[in-house]
Amino acid sequence: MQDGDPSVHGETAAFKNAGRQRSYRGTTMVTTLSPCWFCSGLIRQFGISRVVIGEAQTFYGGHDWLAENGVEVVLLDDPECIEMMTRFIAEQPEIWFEDIGQD
C-alpha cells in the first residue's frame, strides 16, 4: 500500500509509472508477492505476458489463475523475499491486513 491508498500495490504503481503504451504484450512484470486478484486482473486486462514472483508463501494470490489463462508465471519462492515479508507482516499487521483486504 503506497501513498495511503490501499489500491496502490507494487503492480499497480509499476503499471502507472510505465505510462501509456501501445501494447503491454511481451512485458514481464516482477513482483515480490503473488499478485492479488485486483493486480492479477490488471495483468490479464492489459496482456502482460510474463510474471516473475519472489514468493507465494505469505500470500497466495492469483498466479495459478494467471497461468491457467496463458500468462507465463515464474515462482521463485526466494528465501530473502519470504523473510522480508514475514518480518513486515509481524511488524506491521494492521497495514498488511488492510492491504490484502482482511480483518
What kind of feature is each model-predicted range?
Residues C81-D103:
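Acidic/histidine-enriched, glycine/proline-rich intrinsically disordered or flexible terminal extensions
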Residues M1-T86:
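Zn2+-dependent cytidine deaminase-like catalytic core
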